[in-house]
UniProtKB/Swiss-Prot annotation:
Alphabetized GO MF terms: nuclease activity
Protein name: Putative pre-16S rRNA nuclease
UniProt record similarity statement: Belongs to the YqgF nuclease family.
One cellular-component annotation, GO: cytosol
The EC number(s) this enzyme carries: 3.1.-.-
Alphabetical keyword list: Cytoplasm, Hydrolase, Nuclease, Ribosome biogenesis
Naturally occurring in which organism (per UniProt): Francisella philomiragia subsp. philomiragia (strain ATCC 25017 / CCUG 19701 / FSC 153 / O#319-036)
Length: 136
């Protein structure tokens, strides 16, 4: 059974992160890890995985609006394989369509003074995790 979870909003420049619990079906933004052309700062990601010690990791799969794969979809799948091998955790992929749009909307709803990329990416990871938990 799933216990604690981490969700990842994969991106070429930044990777958004959220943590969650299946028992409460809630997700909380953790922050972001910088990436260079899709390669994350593995040292920082290692620290986060060690600290949160998730049973499973959920990774958003970037598809286009008609659920077709894009250039970044392959990069996200390769990243997911690396995460699975590196951390020896179950990795789940989920369509992340509109997660960034939903994150921006949520920040605007709470009148966040500064809608930064960091906030958006971490909140997008929350949306990904909430969606996955609702389906599982």
């Amino acid at each position: 059974m799933f216990q604690s979870l981490i969700a990842i909003d994969y991106g070429k420049a930044r990777i958004g992160l959220a943590s969650g619990q299946m028992i409460t079906k809630t997700a909380t933004p953790i922050g972001t890890v910088e990436a260079y052309d899709g390669v994350p700062n593995w040292i920082e990601l290692d620290k986060i995985v060690k600290r949160w010690n998730p049973s499973d990791i959920v990774i958003g799969l970037p598809l286009d609006t008609q659920d077709f794969e894009t250039d970044i979809t392959k990069a996200a799948k390769d990243f997911a394989k690396e995460v699975k091998e590196r951390y020896k955790r179950n990795v789940h992929l989920i369509n992340e369509a509109y997660s960034t749009r939903e994150a921006r909307w949520r920040l605007e709803e709470v009148k966040s003074k500064k809608v930064s990329h960091i906030k958006v990416d971490a909140l997008a990871a929350c949306v990904i995790l909430e969606t996955w938990m609702a389906e599982n």
